């Protein structure tokens, strides 16, 4: 069974642990709307702001000629997304961003409004509630509405479908988010140079049910600070905030190298040994007789490969401070102290 959003092959033991009928799982996994975890837990994905904006835009165009109560739009990963239209009138449609299991997603339930009129060709405009980019270096040019390139392509594709369905020459669509300015203050936008609303984002069209700093915004946040901690997960994030209170802490998961490419200034890499040390030496367990880095640490804390992997991480860090912690926040290795 393959998760079509991230192309991950789900292990059979994870599927068995879920306790759910296989047919039901296959259907939901194929839709892109659920994630199966290693313990068998099933979490619900949602749709990104890009997908929701696409639905509002397409529905607005369709409403020029007919009544619309639901809409289907393409996503960047090739799946179709299906959303209800909560309100519509000729040339105007409202779509709500559906809830998901991402507890920190402040945009859940937010209304996206599309306003459309017939035109020559297709044009997409950002209206009230979509932030404006105020600095250089982001994916969207300074002074433009904060609709990232991938969701802009998605919105245009959705509008193109509507235009072709109705036989129009084109359409001009304005996307508005009535509560966008208020919600934007609860996001990272002000820290990366986007003001006046939220950003329209989404590289896959789906929101993962955990906080990864909203995908592509992660790189923007790293680039906008000169004191950053790149951490590997929730535990690392919690203790990094405690260990390095003067730093901006960004969770990069296994994408440590990608985070480093975006970072400059004072950089710390902090996390659990399983990710940090294996990033240093991906082959550290080969032929060692140990199944995991944690097992090696517990059974052979002085193992030469632990030291070797740490030294390789320091070398790959190119001057970044490397800090390895355990699950209770104790520092196991620190390149600054030589520990």
From Swiss-Prot:
<dbReference type="GO" id="GO:0032259">
    <property type="term" value="P:methylation"/>
</dbReference>
<comment type="similarity">
    <text>Belongs to the CbiD family.</text>
</comment>
<dbReference type="Pfam" id="PF01888">
    <property type="entry name" value="CbiD"/>
</dbReference>
<keyword id="KW-0169">Cobalamin biosynthesis</keyword>
<keyword id="KW-0808">Transferase</keyword>
<protein>
    <recommendedName>
        <fullName>Cobalt-precorrin-5B C(1)-methyltransferase</fullName>
        <ecNumber>2.1.1.195</ecNumber>
    </recommendedName>
</protein>
<keyword id="KW-0949">S-adenosyl-L-methionine</keyword>
<dbReference type="InterPro" id="IPR002748">
    <property type="entry name" value="CbiD"/>
</dbReference>
<dbReference type="GO" id="GO:0043780">
    <property type="term" value="F:cobalt-precorrin-5B C1-methyltransferase activity"/>
</dbReference>
<dbReference type="GO" id="GO:0019251">
    <property type="term" value="P:anaerobic cobalamin biosynthetic process"/>
</dbReference>
<comment type="pathway">
    <text>Cofactor biosynthesis; adenosylcobalamin biosynthesis; cob(II)yrinate a,c-diamide from sirohydrochlorin (anaerobic route): step 6/10.</text>
</comment>
<dbReference type="InterPro" id="IPR036074">
    <property type="entry name" value="CbiD_sf"/>
</dbReference>
<keyword id="KW-0489">Methyltransferase</keyword>
